[in-house]
Amino acid sequence: MKAIVWSKDQCPYCDQAKALLKSRNIEFEERNIMHDWTREQLLEAVPNARTVPQIFLDDELVGGFTELRTKLTESK
């Protein structure tokens, strides 16, 4: 399983999502919209995104941290 995490600095839910992925040994690519990526690129990937994190697992949009936690709990 591989993940993409759209994030920004000083975002507690982004930090929690990355920590959860690390604890499950799931590789992820972080796309920080305050550094190497833009908000426009995020909106191309997730047109209705209103918040970060926006998380993809194996190229499928999961949603934010709460949805990620639910999905990973269900797949245990």
Tell me the role of every PLM-derived stretch.
Residues K2, L43-E44, E74-K76:
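C-terminal alpha-helical interaction module
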Residues V46-I55, F65-T66:
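Structural micro-motif
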Residues M1-I26:
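Local sequence-structure signature of Cys/Sec-based thiol-disulfide redox active-site neighborhoods
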Residues P12, W37, G63:
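Short alpha-helical
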Residues L57-K76:
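Non-catalytic, surface beta->alpha helical segment in thiol-disulfide oxidoreductase systems
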Residues E29:
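Conserved beta-strand positions in the Rossmann-like core of class I SAM-dependent methyltransferases
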Residues N32-N48:
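Thioredoxin-like thiol-disulfide oxidoreductase module
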Residues D15, E40, T70:
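Alpha-helical elements of the RecA-like P-loop NTPase motor core of helicases
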